[in-house]
A protein has these predicted regions:
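Catalytic domains of carbohydrate-active enzymes, especially glycoside hydrolases
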Residues: 20, 24-45, 79
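Residue-level marker of alpha-helix boundaries and capping positions
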Residues: 19, 57-60
Length: 149
């Protein structure tokens, strides 16, 4: 929820803090550079850009955070490879639309994509649309926020 972001499905399901990338990305990226990484794949959390997934305006704090991550990668000569959706549909979209069961999600997704493409177009060359989209069949809620009655 930091940086004025919304709630993700994973936030509610996690039982621990993990690596706390939000506060330690500079050290993490420096370690990656020390190990010789030339590319760093990471995800942009949709709800950090549009807290509810369907907000009128993007969250500038979230946009600035990812810009700082991208700039840190570039500082060390690493190519950022950005995943647009990595099992992190905003929870408000699940409640309002039923996630991807509703075609209304397409407009929300396209708005999110346009926002990040326009913001980072001079800094990011490689984009992945969905992480492991096939996982929707095995884990519909975790992969896409889809609940079945």
């Amino acid at each position: 929820d930091e940086g004025n972001g919304g709630v993700l499905t994973w936030v509610r399901l996690s039982i621990h803090e993990a690596i706390d990338f939000y506060h330690h990305y500079k050290e993490d990226i420096a370690f990656f550079a020390e190990m010789g990484f030339k590319c760093y794949r990471f995800s942009i959390a949709w709800s950090r850009i549009y807290p509810n997934g369907f907000d009128e305006e993007p969250n500038e704090d979230g946009l600035q955070f990812y810009e700082a991550v991208i700039d840190e990668c570039r500082k060390y000569g690493m190519e950022p490879l950005v995943t647009i959706v990595h099992f992190d549909v905003p929870q408000a979209c699940i409640k309002r639309f039923g996630s991807w069961k509703s075609r209304e999600m397409i407009d929300c997704y396209l708005k999110y994509c346009r926002t990040i493409f326009n913001r980072y177009k001079r800094k990011v060359r490689y984009w992945l649309t969905f992480n492991e989209i096939n996982m929707i069949l095995k884990h519909p809620f975790l992969a896409a926020g889809i609940l079945f009655e």
